[in-house]
Each structure stands twice: as C-alpha cells, then as structure tokens.
C-alpha cells in the first residue's frame, strides 16, 4: 500500500539524504545581485562613488552631492537556474542551465535635500536565487527515487533611510537598513521498489517564510583638493540577523554585511570639447554570513571595473558603458558568476528625466541580463 509521508519521516524510513536541500553548482547571486542602475553597464564599478537614489544603501555619504529632489526606479530580470539530476540520490550529479527568469522592480528610491544635507529613501533588491532541480530513476540502495523535483527561492530586499552631508572635500553619511528575507523550499519525490516497480512511498515538503532584521550603513566619500577629478569612497553595511523566520532559519538566517571600496576618475576632452570619460573600480567584501546553513555563506570578494564615455550629440548626453564583474562563489554548492557588461544612457538637455538601459552577459553562458532604469528630477533640472 502506498504511503504519503512527511519529509523527516520519509527520509529516515527510506534512508534518503539527510538534508531537505542539496544544491549543485548554482551561479551565485544570493548576495551580489546588481539592482540594475546606471552602474550595472559598467561592471558595478560606480555604486560607491555615484550620487543618486541608490546611494541611500550603497554609500549614503554621496547623498550629500544631490542638490535637487529626484526619484529613481529600476526594472530587471531575476535569473533562474535549472538542473537535471542524475546518478544516485545520495550522490547526485547536476547538469545545470541558466534562464532569463521573471522581470521585477528591483529599486525604487527618492532623495531630497534638507537644511544640512540630503535624505534618501530606497527599496533595493540585493540578492536573489531561484534554483530548480529535477530527475528520475535515481538509485538509492535497494530502492529508487522517481519524479524528483525541488525548487529553492531566496530573495533579499533592503528598505533604507539614510542621510548624507557635503562637508567640502569629504562627505559623510549614515543610514538604517531593514532587510526582508524571503525563503521557499519545495520538494516532491516518489520512492519505488525496483524489483516490483511499485510505489512504496512519497515525500512532499513545502517550507516558506519571511524573516526581517535591522542593520546600519555608514559611508565616507573624499575628493582630493589637488585632484578634483578623483573620488575615493568607502561604505560599510552591517550583517543582519533575521527574526520571525522560525520555519526557514535552518536554510538561511543571517544576511552578510558588505564593505565597499570604490574609486572613480574623470578625464575630459577625449574625442570632443564637451565629451568626458569616467573610469571606475569597486571591491565589495561580503562578511559575517553563516556557513552552517542549507544556503551557506562564506566571506568573499566581488570585483567590478568599467568605464563610461559621455558623448554630447543631438541635444542630449549619451553615456556609453562597458565593464566586467567578477563574482566568485559565496558558499558551498555555488559557482562563480562573472559577467561582461555594457549599457547606454540618455540625458536630454533641459528635461527632468534620464533613462539607462544596461546589460550583463554571464561568461559561463546563459541569457544576457537586462535592466531599465529611469530617474526623474522632481525638484527641477540640476
């Protein structure tokens, strides 16, 4: 007689894997998802040094450069990875492929000057994972696992309120960050006796939930007196421990912190009297995660470099961007996700809006990521 058993019982009775989740080499965007701003097209090289609505989270010090109110929004794809599972159930072999995934709003922000500086409010998606696994005919001792399917989703959203102040050559900023972490793990399988080809049991599990936590972000931005075309910036976001996530804490229970160092350099008049080029480099060090969770996190360094050439033609400024991003594995079961990036912006003269279209092509294969960002000067043209 077929039995439908809960996860823990079926794993024990039939001697299956002791973990509800087993990841293959999944491209790692759990912490390092680019929210899709202007900087995405330049390898993520300008988040620490740029001044826009993203600064509330990435570096609140640069809010101090904003002298008129602005609104920003970004849309991008959220990649999905799918893996075909072969071999035995307790020693699985994964053959993976990445897909474009769904489209979503990944940033909404507002910045406005106040008496002594600038306040920024933002929603930003900073991490994403959606991995699906499927296989059948997986040997497991004297039994066989058929119709195996498992899906794991992780999404980290940050809600931030920050303040930045322009103090001459050096800006300072700080903010409060609320993290909302969504986790889902769903799995189904059938246990079969290969001698009789009869189903002897099934296992179904569906665990999901949200956890929230409170953290902080601080930043500093410096422009040397003797080199006004250079900016050096640093920001630090604390690790965030999650609360209210009893059902999913074994899967993921702490959002790693991030220390960021960024440099940007401007040069003028390369190919035209008004044109200028901006070069950038950024290093993001993720730290303070937990290695003993189902989605493990270790300390790791993500690097980005790129350039933006600003062309003045047809009554508009056209930023053209190229870059590279190197994102190594952030934990066991994950793979690097490096990318070549490019993008185009549009800044019409005497208008309040700006548009940015950016792309990132993973070097390991898969569809090209795409983002659309729009900025609107609420308080007038800067």
Feature annotation, model-predicted:
Residues 2-3, 58, 307:
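Residue-level micro-sites within transmembrane alpha helices that shape
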Residues 2-3, 15, 75, 81, ...:
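Short, intrinsically disordered low-complexity segments
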Residues 18-125:
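N-terminal, post-signal peptide beta-strand-biased segments of exported outer-membrane/organellar beta-barrel
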Residues 2-22:
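Gram-negative bacterial Sec-dependent N-terminal signal peptides
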Residues 13-14, 69, 170:
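Alpha-helical transmembrane segments and their juxtamembrane interfaces
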Residues 23-40, 104-382:
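Outer-membrane beta-barrel porins/channels
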